[in-house]
């Protein structure tokens, strides 16, 4: 993984209190199996309490973790979307609006945003997933550097009935 002029990579994700233990399990697997170092920034759907945030910081110890203030972040993103009423409406009315816009405006000085869904569990070591040189001419979505990812449904863990 490359860092831009000593700048740490920041990987962002959206979480909420409803599935918090599962999200943390997945995010800890990301940290555990990534050979590359990064900071983690968590956006909230607005449901996180102070005790949830304390729990997050107690659980994730191997990387720097920051958590957005949902209200302040929403106001900032809506300001950034000034003059784009459809985008503002989408941001206000949909969880997908949070997921789509908030990572883009976290650091306006950094043109690259790394975003990962919080419900992806990693099962083996990997490197190079967050590589600035691969984003020079646009964006990469759903990147799998090894082409051997697996999709498992919850019932796969229970067995056949």
Question: What is each of the regions a protein language model found here?
Answer:
Residues 41-46, 71-74, 99, 135-136, ...:
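Short C-terminal domain-edge/linker segments immediately following a structured domain
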Residues 26-27, 55-57, 128-131, 155-156:
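Short, glycine/charged-enriched secondary-structure capping and boundary segments
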Residues 36-38, 42, 56-59, 87-89, ...:
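N-terminal, helix-rich and Lys/Arg-enriched segments in bacterial and organellar proteins
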Residues 95, 99-145:
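GT-A fold catalytic core of metal-dependent nucleotide-sugar glycosyltransferases
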Residues 1-80:
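N-terminal anchoring/stem segment of glycosyltransferases
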